[in-house]
């Protein structure tokens, strides 16, 4: 449940109004005046909390819940205890998120950590930088020459914005983030500790002079409505730019190499490693700890299972997984075949007595 120490306390709201907000049906209208004061999980909810249920793994929690009301699909409605008011919704979690966004908008987009509403006295801003009205710069942030920052953007504590960087409106640059050689659109959320625009890993290896560094003279382009998780690193391009497409959501601790192009509305889970000059299409989903080799193409709509290693191009809408990754149906068949071989070898009487 939301802690009032960190987040705004929701307004006390009648169930009838919650049904309207969530577009759910209150099965027993006589409970419409019951007041809800917060959101909680099934196991932590009390009589004045709203919860949701959409996964049978939590059936025991539903049975024991003390929640005042529960969003649930018609399929599971009969399992809700009698003391819990039922809000019928085709997609319970989506309905729950709808009211969570209504009540906890402050959790969607971080603001100044220190309650700052302007330029902190300890911030260092080059006189050639251009900041629109309404920009917030927290203490100890550094903004370099010729930087442009749009209105509504928050630059966190200790963040460093290098010369010539352009950041759009209504963005958030997390504490201790470093940005250089980058152009960033509107509504971009960059969590703390990110590094954007640093050198890519470019060398001529094992030559007579050792490892010869290749100049990295490209940029990072981040389009509108992108989210970049904490501790993520995005290298600038060597010749062409590194591009993150509109609406893409990147989890924590992801490494994106130089010259990578990521399309629109992609999903990248934590600890992914993308090697250089990789092209990823639109609406691609990559599971946690996926590694993808350089110079590959991942087609629109492709999905890759967590902890897979990709060394080949993936066609549009491909479903791949494994190490090395291959179409998931083939991967599963091979796993079953290997398990069968192991099982059969153990049952072979010729193997008795062998080490």
Swiss-Prot record:
Listed transmembrane segments: none
Single GO MF descriptor: N-acyltransferase activity
Pathway per the UniProt entry: Bacterial outer membrane biogenesis; LPS lipid A biosynthesis
Biological process (GO), any one: lipid A biosynthetic process
Residues at the active site: 258
Keyword tags: Acyltransferase, Lipid A biosynthesis, Lipid biosynthesis, Lipid metabolism, Repeat, Transferase
Catalyzed reactions: a UDP-3-O-[(3R)-3-hydroxyacyl]-alpha-D-glucosamine + a (3R)-hydroxyacyl-[ACP] = a UDP-2-N,3-O-bis[(3R)-3-hydroxyacyl]-alpha-D-glucosamine + holo-[ACP] + H(+)
CDD domains hit by this protein: LbH_LpxD
EC number: 2.3.1.191
Subunit structure of this chain's protein: Homotrimer.
PANTHER family: UDP-3-O-ACYLGLUCOSAMINE N-ACYLTRANSFERASE (PTHR43378), UDP-3-O-ACYLGLUCOSAMINE N-ACYLTRANSFERASE 1, MITOCHONDRIAL-RELATED (PTHR43378:SF2)
Protein role: Catalyzes the N-acylation of UDP-3-O-acylglucosamine using 3-hydroxyacyl-ACP as the acyl donor. Is involved in the biosynthesis of lipid A, a phosphorylated glycolipid that anchors the lipopolysaccharide to the outer membrane of the cell.
Name of this chain's protein: UDP-3-O-acylglucosamine N-acyltransferase
Protein source organism: Bradyrhizobium diazoefficiens (strain JCM 10833 / BCRC 13528 / IAM 13628 / NBRC 14792 / USDA 110)
């Amino acid at each position: 449940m939301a802690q009032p120490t960190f987040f705004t306390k929701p307004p006390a709201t009648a169930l009838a109004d919650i049904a309207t907000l969530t577009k759910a049906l209150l099965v027993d209208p006589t409970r419409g005046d019951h007041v809800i004061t917060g959101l909680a999980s099934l196991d932590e909810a009390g009589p004045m909390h709203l919860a949701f249920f959409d996964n049978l793994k939590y059936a025991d929690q539903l049975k024991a819940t003390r929640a005042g009301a529960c969003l649930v699909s018609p399929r599971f409605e009969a399992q809700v205890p009698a003391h819990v008011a039922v809000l019928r919704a085709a997609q319970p979690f989506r309905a729950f998120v709808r009211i969570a966004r209504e009540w906890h908008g402050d959790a969607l987009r971080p603001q100044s950590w220190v309650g700052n509403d302007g330029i902190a006295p300890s911030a260092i801003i080059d006189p050639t930088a251009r900041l629109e009205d309404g920009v917030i710069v927290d203490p100890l942030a550094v903004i370099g020459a010729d930087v442009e920052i749009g209105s509504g953007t928050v630059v966190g504590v200790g963040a460093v914005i290098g010369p010539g960087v352009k950041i759009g409106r209504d963005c958030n640059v997390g504490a201790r983030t470093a940005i250089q050689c980058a152009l960033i659109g509107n509504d971009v959320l960059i969590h703390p500790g990110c590094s954007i625009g640093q050198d890519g890993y470019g060398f001529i290896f094992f030559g007579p002079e050792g490892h010869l560094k290749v100049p990295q003279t490209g940029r990072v382009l981040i389009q509108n409505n992108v989210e970049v998780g904490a501790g993520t690193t995005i290298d600038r391009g060597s010749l062409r730019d590194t591009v993150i497409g509109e609406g893409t959501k990147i989890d924590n601790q992801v490494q994106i190499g130089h010259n990578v192009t990521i399309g629109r509305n992609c999903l990248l889970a934590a600890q992914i490693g993308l090697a250089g000059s990789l092209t990823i299409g639109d609406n691609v989903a990559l599971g946690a700890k996926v590694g993808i080799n350089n110079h590959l193409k991942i087609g629109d709509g492709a999905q890759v299972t967590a902890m897979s290693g990709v060394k080949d191009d993936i066609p549009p809408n491909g479903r791949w997984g494994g190490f090395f990754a291959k179409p998931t149906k083939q991967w599963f068949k091979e796993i079953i075949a290997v398990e069968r071989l192991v099982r059969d070898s153990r049952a072979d009487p010729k193997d008795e007595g062998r080490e």
